[in-house]
């Protein structure tokens, strides 16, 4: 046999990836060839930088420093242990309450697939908890009728935003016989919304509620074309509407194969099969954060109300017998097929609208196909939801009179100003960007926690009182002197700010806690700190008459206030001609241009490393044992700001200061612009 005439021969070992990971994990557990040490809360984890860099984009960036020790302060040792298991075994075991921490860690470390899995699991858990809560409410039967109406209409009102994104499920000329498959299964279901047409879900729910008001109970929808979930038989007073709307999160039952077959009717079988393989759509960031928050809140509030789960095969009193749900939630992804109807003609009987006091504009038959595409997409939905919104707001004001409530997640806040600040979290507007890697975050706290990953470095010595890190032991001993004697300093563990007195730290902590105990004598507005109140008082003196309604800062002229407010509103009028990136302030755009030109006008005097902007240079100086940007040329003491250096120089005697001394000589950096 002539081997030279044979083509290329391919040899493949299908078990190689699994065996490679398994061997790497064994070496990690044995401490063999580990070349990096990750410290989390004084606990060391030995690992291989290649494995971590392949798993996490953030580790890949950090490991370019060729350091052996890194410190992570934004997660717990338990969470990082789970991250390690995931990196070395491609699996991890976690409880439901750990998903929130895993999601946050995966986002910062940029482990994309783990982040997606946590998002989907949080959505699934939230949907399951919503069904459990509704069933508990049906068993108790002690809830007020007005509260129940407000809750359902609130869900309808919340779906307004999702409806504008999903669009019509059925438009003119596409009224197919039989069920249709909605094309937007990624619409958030964290509030009990289905993947069906949002308008139909709203009208069906409203009609059911109206019938309950007229007849005293909710009747299940009649007709052979309305599919219901397996495991029905819930109390018809509350659970029926929820059951119908949550079909998108349920796996089709083996007892009802017709439901699965109907999902591929109408000539759309291939698309449905592909979507079934992909699993449910990835939810939006705002919905999953809300889901995680509601997951914790809901368990705390209903801990005393939820009865213990029934054993398998035993049905609770008053319900048909059906298998009990699994006791724990696992990191599995459901492959579900949305199979809801979306009829073209939606009608609302006048009897229902009269019972609910709905305006006459809703008590008509609405045939979308008659408009022939003349109206803008989403116009009818917006008009309908504006009416439902007025009704929901009216009912909410009657049932809740204490404080203000977020219309998205339902959390109660002390005043309207706090609600407006809170709503920014739901908008998903990430206005805080990292200057080192470009990643953006919802608030400054998450950005500061992310920056710790950049500034970790090789710092093995940690202060046990404030958490400050140093690369040399003598630097740590020098730092510890600040915690002793009359000059003892205290630090905020949340933001790292330093204070000379415990009372000042306590006042500062009230800002993090959201306590507002300082009241303006002129306008009775409340503020979280004395400093914020003093800043606000400038608006009454006339020196700084222009006040920011978001944070209370005052300015001398309107143009400065306008520039400042862009930080809160997210407006970015300055756009880069090269890459299209937008900025709130003009000087930010000018600094950004240096990315394209390669200009680095700031130079470190200690190691001659150059940076594009001042803030990056300040961050770099901290890598030199935490050096502040200004150093006295007489006593070599460091100062954190130019004003503090000026105050420090006043403490020196005039004869100690050289005749050619200038303040610029205290700078630890050079600026060539």
Curated annotation (Swiss-Prot):
Keyword annotations from UniProtKB, A to Z: Chromosomal rearrangement, Disease variant, DNA-binding, Intellectual disability, Metal-binding, Nucleus, Phosphoprotein, Proto-oncogene, Repeat, Repressor, Transcription, Transcription regulation, Ubl conjugation pathway, Zinc, Zinc-finger
Bias (Basic and acidic residues): 293-302, 319-331
Chain positions found as Phosphothreonine: 282
GO CC annotation: cytosol; male germ cell nucleus; nuclear body; nuclear speck; nucleus; PML body; protein-containing complex; transcription repressor complex
SUPFAM superfamilies cross-referenced by the UniProt entry: beta-beta-alpha zinc fingers, POZ domain
MF terms (GO), sorted A to Z: DNA binding; DNA-binding transcription activator activity, RNA polymerase II-specific; DNA-binding transcription repressor activity, RNA polymerase II-specific; identical protein binding; protein domain specific binding; protein homodimerization activity; RNA polymerase II cis-regulatory region sequence-specific DNA binding; transcription corepressor binding
Modification Phosphoserine occurs at: 76, 184, 197, 256, 628
Subcellular location: Nucleus; Nucleus, Nuclear body
PROSITE patterns the record matches: BTB, ZINC_FINGER_C2H2_1, ZINC_FINGER_C2H2_2
Site (Breakpoint for translocation to form PLZF-RAR-alpha oncogene): 394-395
SMART domains on file: BTB, ZnF_C2H2
Induction: By retinoic acid.
Tissue-specific expression: Within the hematopoietic system, PLZF is expressed in bone marrow, early myeloid cell lines and peripheral blood mononuclear cells. Also expressed in the ovary, and at lower levels, in the kidney and lung.
Zinc finger (C2H2-type): 404-426, 432-454, 461-483, 490-512, 518-540, 546-568, 574-596, 602-624, 630-652
UniProt keyword Glycoprotein, yes or no: no
Biological role: Acts as a transcriptional repressor. Transcriptional repression may be mediated through recruitment of histone deacetylases to target promoters. May play a role in myeloid maturation and in the development and/or maintenance of other differentiated tissues. Probable substrate-recognition component of an E3 ubiquitin-protein ligase complex which mediates the ubiquitination and subsequent proteasomal degradation of target proteins.
Subunit structure, interactors included: Binds EPN1. Interacts with ZBTB32 and CUL3. Interacts with ATP7B. Interacts with transcriptional corepressor RUNX1T1 (via its N-terminus); the interaction increases the transcription repression activity of ZBTB16. Interacts (via C2H2-type zinc finger domains 1 and 2) with RNF112.
Name of this protein: Zinc finger and BTB domain-containing protein 16
Organism, scientific name: Homo sapiens
């Amino acid at each position: 046999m002539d081997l030279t005439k044979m083509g290329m021969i391919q040899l493949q070992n299908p078990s190689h990836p699994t065996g490679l990971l398994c061997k790497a994990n064994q070496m990690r557990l044995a401490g063999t060839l580990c070349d990096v040490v990750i410290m989390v809360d004084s606990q060391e984890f030995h690992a291989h930088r290649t494995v971590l860099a392949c798993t996490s984009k953030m580790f890949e960036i950090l490991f370019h420093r060729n350091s052996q020790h890194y410190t992570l302060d934004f997660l717990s040792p338990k969470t990082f242990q789970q991250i390690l298991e995931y990196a070395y075994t491609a699996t991890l075991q976690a409880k439901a309450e750990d998903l929130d921490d895993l999601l946050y860690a995966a986002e910062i470390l940029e482990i994309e697939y783990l982040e997606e899995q946590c998002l989907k699991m949080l959505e699934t858990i939230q949907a399951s908890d919503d069904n459990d809560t509704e069933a508990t409410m049906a068993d108790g039967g002690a809830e007020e009728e007005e509260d129940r109406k407000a809750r359902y209409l609130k869900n309808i009102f919340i779906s307004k935003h999702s409806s504008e994104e999903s669009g019509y499920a059925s438009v003119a000329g596409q009224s197919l016989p039989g069920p249709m498959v909605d094309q937007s299964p990624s619409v958030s279901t964290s509030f009990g919304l289905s993947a069906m047409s949002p308008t139909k879900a709203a009208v069906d729910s409203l009609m059911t509620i109206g019938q309950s008001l007229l007849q005293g109970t909710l009747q299940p929808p009649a007709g052979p074309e309305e599919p219901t979930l397996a495991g029905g038989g819930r109390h018809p007073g509350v659970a029926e509407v929820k059951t119908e709307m949550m079909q998108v999160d349920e796996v089709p039952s083996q007892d009802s194969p017709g439901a699965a077959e109907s999902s591929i009717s109408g000539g759309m079988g291939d698309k449905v099969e592909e979507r079934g393989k992909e699993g449910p759509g990835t939810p939006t960031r705002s919905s999953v954060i809300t889901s995680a928050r509601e997951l914790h809140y809901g368990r705390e509030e209903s801990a005393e109300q939820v009865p213990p789960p029934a054993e398998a095969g035993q049905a609770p009193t008053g319900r048909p017998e059906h298998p009990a749900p699994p006791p724990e939630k696992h990191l599995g992804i459901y492959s579900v097929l949305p199979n809801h109807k979306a009829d073209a003609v939606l009608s609302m009987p006048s009897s229902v609208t009269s019972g609910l006091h709905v305006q006459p504009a809703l008590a008509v038959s609405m045939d979308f196909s008659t408009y022939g595409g003349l109206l803008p997409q989403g116009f009818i939905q917006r008009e309908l939801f504006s009416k439902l919104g007025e009704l929901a707001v009216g009912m909410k004001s009657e049932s809740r009179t204490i404080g203000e409530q977020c219309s998205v997640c339902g959390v109660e806040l002390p005043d309207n100003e706090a609600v407006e600040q809170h709503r920014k979290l739901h908008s998903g507007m990430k206005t805080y960007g990292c200057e080192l890697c470009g990643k953006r975050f919802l608030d400054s706290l998450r950005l500061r926690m992310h920056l710790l990953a950049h500034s970790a470095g090789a710092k093995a010595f940690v202060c046990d009182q404030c958490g400050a890190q140093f690369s040399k032991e003598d630097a740590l001993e020098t730092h510890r002197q600040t915690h002793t004697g009359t000059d003892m300093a205290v630090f905020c563990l949340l933001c790292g700010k330093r204070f000379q007195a415990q009372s000042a730290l306590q006042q500062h902590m009230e800002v993090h806690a959201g306590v507002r105990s300082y009241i303006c004598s002129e306008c009775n507005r409340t503020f979280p700190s004395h400093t914020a109140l003093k800043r606000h008082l400038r608006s009454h003196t006339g020196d700084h008459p222009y006040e920011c309604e978001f944070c209370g800062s005052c300015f001398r002229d309107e143009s400065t206030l306008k520039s400042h407010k862009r930080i809160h509103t997210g407006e970015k009028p300055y756009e880069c001609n090269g890459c299209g990136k937008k900025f709130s302030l003009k000087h930010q755009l000018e600094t950004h241009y240096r990315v394209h030109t390669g200009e680095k006008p700031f130079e470190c005097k200690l190691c001659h490393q150059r940076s594009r902007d001042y803030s990056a240079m300040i961050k770099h100086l901290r890598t030199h044992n935490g050096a502040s940007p200004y150093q006295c040329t007489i006593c070599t003491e460091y100062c954190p700001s130019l004003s503090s250096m000026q105050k420090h120089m006043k403490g020196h005697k005039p004869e100690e200061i050289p005749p050619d001394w200038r303040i610029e000589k205290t700078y630890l950096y050079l600026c060539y612009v």
